[in-house]
Amino acid sequence: MGRGLMDQRSCGSSGKFSVCCWLGTAVFLPLLISQSWATQRKPGDQDASRRRLDRQTIQLGTGARVEFSQFHSAALDSDREYSIFLPSTYGSGSKFYPVVYFLHGLWNDHTSWTVDRYGDLHEMIDKMIGEKKIPEILMVHPRGDNSFYTNFVDGHQNYEDYITSDLIQQIEKTYRAKSGRQWRVIGGTSMGGFGALKIAFKRKDLFSATAAHSPIVLPKDPSLITANGQNSERIEFFTKLMAPIFGNPIDPVRWHENDPLSLARVLDLKGLRIYFDYGTADRYNQMIGLGEGIRALDEVLTQRGVPHVFVEHPNEPHGWELVSQHLADSLSFLCRDFEN
């Protein structure tokens, strides 16, 4: 496949494949997390919890709008916020719409996609609809904290169930959202890309397509992350952050049950449309070899004969910055089978 060019990957010859062992260094996710904190926490963005509650409806000139709301999640036993894009025709008539669910990354929240420094993505979506590049859709951004959209070991903070059960029910009972997997797709960026892939892989009964920008593809053997004493402060921070999700020490079984690369090796993914991309200038390529992990996912899917789209963008960055440049590509892919 030509790098940087969209390519529909289909069947390939089977063969033995292994993840590069260097991914299991002691600095994999500790560095990811510490660098995410540094890059995501910027001036004017310190009090995320207050911002969640203060946001008012964003009204666009076309009549489209973004609403901010919350509901009680049984899976989390707490109230959770979300934002939703409603197209210009939503305010009149009785039309029902397909739904795109989109998951944010570490230290972001459900409001991040609407702020200037991330490209005012709601305006991009509205423009794409106006130009008939995608059909009219609802687009939902749930607050996911730093959960990797995974059920916690305590059995009470069940973030995967929150997305796959509570959120879908909330949207379909509150808004004119079409039900059924053919009308639901899921995307995300960074940690949210991880969540979108793994949820779609596990629950293709709920979602017909998935798209992930700069997805965090986890290392093969999580026990190697804390195998030595280097970067002890970062390891301690990582351990505390990830312990509720994967246990302390990390439970390899739970890890592989949620790792997109591991899931891609064993699950039947045929019938699920899959798109993912990353930039060769992604800050995590040098730090943790993110590009290697993503290319490994491409290779596994190809070897298993699972059709998918994989795009490598030359000299482009990580996360929302990449999304702002290529959301049109992923949305066009996700919405391809929706009725206009």
Label every model-predicted segment.
Residues M1-K16:
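N-terminal secretory signal peptides that target proteins for export/translocation
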Residues G2-L5, L32, W37, Y101:
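Intrinsic low-complexity/disordered segments
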Residues G12, C20-W22, R336:
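Secreted/luminal cysteine- and crosslink-motif detector
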Residues S13-K16, P30, N248:
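Intrinsically disordered, low-complexity regions enriched in Ser/Pro/Gly/Gln/His and often acidic
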Residues W22-L31:
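Bacterial N-terminal signal peptides
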Residues S36-N340:
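Non-catalytic cap/lid and distal C-terminal segments of serine-dependent acyl enzymes
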